[in-house]
């Protein structure tokens, strides 16, 4: 009887150790990986978004496009190409007018719903979006603090997350930012985080961003990063970005 109990105890200990070892192995595997999310805001545009898609597809690289509904409505073919190319799609806003969007929580909610409706109508799908990017980011200074706080609570009530970025390529600092400057902005800080989210823009006047894209892709490939869409984010990546206040920053 004593030997029987002893064997059971040993079996339980081995089982527990095995489970813990598995968890450790999974965590170790995650820590060894490096993930980058290339994100493009404010499009799609007439031709620049297509040029970006050409580069992404040529390199077999995935990225995520944060869509302005009114621009999607004006460039339906490009919007469909984004979807058909297997790129990520996040609602950004319907009309990129900060004062109107951030006038109230209701204004933001109505604009976001219209953006989602527009995207789904063009790609002929009924998607449910669980991640968005807020215009100007979740800590923008255009929106009042009270309204911004209420918007975040509203998104939470809908089980919708919001994502910012770890790296800003700086292509909105002026109308046209030199390719070399964009490249340097990325190279100065890339590779410092396990999961990186790069902010870029694909409006028609952001062609220098497109010109720098191949160099940016090369940099991340040389650093051993995987390129993914935000929709393909794994739980450990989500938790990592939460802990670094890139997702759902209060």
Short names for language-model regions:
Residues 1-39, 44-60, 74-80, 179-184, ...:
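N-terminal pre-catalytic segment of deacetylase/amide-hydrolase enzymes
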Residues 26-134, 219:
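Active-site beta->alpha N-cap acidic-glycine motif
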């Amino acid at each position: 009887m004593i030997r029987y109990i002893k064997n059971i105890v040993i079996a339980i200990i081995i089982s527990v150790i095995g489970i813990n070892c598995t968890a450790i192995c999974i965590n170790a595997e995650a820590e060894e990986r490096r993930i980058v999310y290339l994100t493009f805001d404010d499009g799609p545009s007439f031709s620049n978004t297509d040029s970006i898609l050409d580069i992404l597809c040529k390199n077999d690289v995935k990225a995520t496009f944060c869509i302005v509904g009114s621009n999607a409505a004006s460039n339906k073919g490009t919007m469909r190409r984004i979807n058909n190319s297997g790129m990520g799609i996040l609602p950004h806003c319907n009309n990129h007018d900060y004062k109107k969007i951030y006038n109230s929580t209701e204004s933001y909610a109505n604009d976001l719903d219209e953006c989602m409706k527009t995207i789904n109508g063009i790609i002929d799908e009924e998607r449910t979006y669980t991640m968005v990017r807020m215009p100007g980011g979740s800590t923008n200074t255009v929106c009042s603090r009270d309204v911004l706080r209420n918007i975040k609570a509203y998104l939470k009530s809908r089980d919708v997350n919001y994502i910012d970025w770890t790296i800003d390529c700086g292509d909105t600092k002026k109308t046209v930012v030199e390719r070399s400057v964009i490249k340097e902005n990325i190279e100065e800080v890339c590779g410092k985080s396990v999961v990186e989210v790069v902010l870029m823009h694909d409006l028609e006047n952001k062609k220098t961003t497109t010109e720098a894209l191949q160099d940016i892709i090369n940099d991340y490939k040389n650093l051993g990063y995987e390129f993914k869409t935000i929709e393909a984010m794994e739980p450990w990546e989500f938790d990592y970005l939460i802990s670094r206040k890139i997702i759902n920053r209060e």
